[in-house]
Amino acid sequence: MSRCAGVLMSISSLPSPYGIGTIGKAAYDFADFLKKSGQKIWQILPVGPTSYGDSPYQAFSTYAGNPYMIDLDFLVRDGLLTSKDLEGRKWGENPEEVDYAQIYETRFDVLRCAFKKFRKNNPKFKSFVKENADWLDNYALYMSVKKNNDMKAWTEWEDEDIKLRKPEAIAKYTAKFKSEIEFWKFVQFMFYQQWADFRK
């Protein structure tokens, strides 16, 4: 095995005007810098959606990507947002620290703006949903029910049937939260599109 050098840095530590690093231009620039400086490895922290405490090692899902890492400027480029959608938003007071509470409030509001403009019959989206149904359906339902329960841990949900994943409860909530489930699938589609482009 030949010797090589690398860097350990979380994507969340990249510079960003939106309170936290993303897989946007700063990520590409940093990767280019590493290549030019002879680095062979960029080790990152897990990129799953963080839960209470915002630790990358405590995620809601093994498979899902972190919505915070979706680059909003790329969504503007793709016509899902406008610069006006981002004007006046609060991302935290200290540019050297991540204000997760503020980002949670702001980012999902912005992503919902993008979702409203997204064409649900997009062939790539439909293909993504179909190919990842084994984890995506459950994840999107889980996040929808969790949001309906004020983001409480599933052990604190009021409906025992959905906590136990009884088939009739799954069918009930899948129908009830159809639009919300589509939103969470959209978020994962956006993450994985940007992630795949970056890793090319």
Set out the residue ranges of the language-model regions.
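Acidic/aromatic-lined carbohydrate-recognition and catalytic surfaces
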Residues: 2-200
